[in-house]
Design a protein with these regions (language model features):
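N-terminal secretory targeting modules
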Residues: 1-57, 70, 88
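Charge-dense, low-complexity intrinsically disordered segments
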Residues: 5, 12, 67, 135, ...
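Internal, well-ordered alpha-helical segments in soluble enzyme and binding-protein domains
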Residues: 21-26, 76, 144, 148, ...
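Residue-level detector of flexible, active-site-proximal loop/helix-junction positions
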Residues: 25, 29, 101-103, 166
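Generic structural signal for beta-strand residues in well-ordered domains
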Residues: 48-49, 87, 116, 152
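Conserved SGNH/GDSL esterase-like catalytic core that processes O-acyl groups on lipids
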Residues: 55-57, 63-143
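Alpha-helical cap/lid subdomain in secreted, periplasmic
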Residues: 110-185
Length: 185
């Protein structure tokens, strides 16, 4: 079933390429590009709580680096760390290894060595949007995620994965691209 969907997607893209390619190039040229959040790439949530801190790593693309917010405390990593501190009753030290626009394959080569420099208890891998827009094959995407997860687990981390957001609802994309990328994601 999965292979059928992949073939259908590529056939649909081929048929719609005369419309989709100019639209994609125009969107890439004119889309609003927001900077990553400012501030330190590490922090502490629940520092007043007792006990040894839980060490959290968020590794990934634009969501990981807080694109769209001013401070990382307001981004995914800061909110996740605060929630973990509240639920666990212990402090959470957090850090981010990420890059706006990076794919999982690129991150495995460029960001994973940096991510492994310090001990981690819990790692969240945040990938999928850029892999969808860069047309990374499902096999290469899964292989890169598995490689990063295996390396992090070998260093003692528990690993979690975020889901790929519903690209079909991204209002910044024209209708045709939303449909194609949403189907692919």
């Amino acid at each position: 079933m999965r292979a059928w969907r992949a073939y259908a997607w590529w056939l649909g893209l081929l048929a719609l390429a005369p419309l989709a390619l100019p639209l994609a190039l125009y969107t890439r040229r004119t889309a609003l590009r927001l900077p990553p959040a400012g501030g330190e790439l590490c922090g502490v949530a629940g520092e007043h709580l007792p006990g040894p801190p839980l060490r959290l790593l968020v590794l990934g693309e634009s969501t990981a680096v807080g694109v769209g917010v001013e401070r990382l405390q307001d981004a995914l990593v800061g909110q996740l760390a605060a929630a973990l501190a509240q639920r666990s009753g212990r402090p959470v030290t957090w850090r981010v290894c990420g890059e706006n626009g990076i794919t999982a394959v690129q991150a495995q080569a460029r960001l994973l060595p940096q991510a492994l420099e310090q001990p981690v208890d819990l790692a969240l891998l945040v990938f999928g949007v850029n892999d969808s827009t860069h047309l990374t094959s499902l096999a290469r995407w899964q292989e890169a995620l598995a490689g990063m997860a295996t390396a992090l687990q070998a260093h003692g981390a528990q690993v979690a994965f975020s889901s790929v957001p519903p690209l079909q609802h991204f209002s910044a994309l024209p209708w045709l691209l939303r449909r194609l990328l949403g189907w692919r994601a």
